[in-house]
Amino acid sequence: MRNAFTLLFETIEERKNNPLPESYTNYLFSKGEDKILKKIGEECSEVIIASKNNDNEELVKEMVDVLYHCFVLLAEKNIPLKDIMEEVTERNGKLSRVGDRREIDTL
């Protein structure tokens, strides 16, 4: 049985491969990577605000928007969802120490 994430990603890929004129997903693909990245940034800001405001209902909605736009980016970059799922599986259960994390050198 496919889960909701798989179904969403399949729908996004279907829109990419078989565009529908009124599709928001196709609009994002037609505008390109910069637009997709801008939307991810906007949605992340909305997640922060919803969390800060302790609005869990809005937080859930905004998290779904972030995931959707990230999935669009994956499709744009031709990265299959299975690659993400494999990485999650690989990391699952592994202890991560703060000192083992890479520092952010540039912003």
UniProtKB/Swiss-Prot annotation:
Gene3D superfamilies: MazG-like (1.10.287.1080). Keywords: Amino-acid biosynthesis, ATP-binding, Cytoplasm, Histidine biosynthesis, Hydrolase, Nucleotide-binding. The keyword Mitochondrion does not apply. It comes from the Bacteria. It catalyses: 1-(5-phospho-beta-D-ribosyl)-ATP + H2O = 1-(5-phospho-beta-D-ribosyl)-5'-AMP + diphosphate + H(+). It is found in: Cytoplasm. SUPFAM superfamilies: all-alpha NTP pyrophosphatases. GO terms for cellular component: cytoplasm. Its EC number is 3.6.1.31. The keyword Magnesium does not apply. GO terms for molecular function: ATP binding; phosphoribosyl-ATP diphosphatase activity. Belongs to the PRA-PH family. HAMAP family: HisE. This is Phosphoribosyl-ATP pyrophosphatase.
